[in-house]
Amino acid sequence: MSKILNTIWQYVRAFVLIYACLYAGIFIASLLPVTIPGSIIGMLILFVLLALQILPAQWVNPGCYLLIRYMALLFVPIGVGVMQYFDLLRAQFGPVVVSCAISTLVVFLVVSWSSQLVHGERKVVGQKGSKE
């Protein structure tokens, strides 16, 4: 019985922490003069808490594993919502495709530039440069 209660406690604690970060993000987003989704701010809060090890990762693991396991099911309402606006999407198909293609190209360029910046050639300390 105590093992069942312990498992239930772990799931409850995980979801309370995840939702606390979500609602903190929503509250902060309502105070900001710019429009940033509260869920994004909430994820950043959760990330900072985990990265600084203020919040132990094992406290949110059960809830995260459960959400990831059923992630495909969570996208069904979004798909239904998109299908409600199918006529609008069909009318704007060209601009949507061009926008996606350009944004993908921009992401490729930014990632390649930043990767080159981070992982580019560096001099090895103590090694003389070769003259060719």
UniProtKB/Swiss-Prot annotation:
Protein name: UPF0299 membrane protein YohJ
Keywords: Cell inner membrane, Cell membrane, Membrane, Transmembrane, Transmembrane helix
One cellular component term from this protein's GO annotations in UniProt: plasma membrane
InterPro entries registered for this protein in UniProt: LrgA/CidA, Uncharacterised_UPF0299
Record membrane topology: Multi-pass membrane protein
Main location: membrane
Encoding gene (name): yohJ
Transmembrane parts of this sequence: 8-28, 31-51, 63-83, 93-113
Subcellular location: Cell inner membrane
Similarity comment: family membership: Belongs to the UPF0299 family.
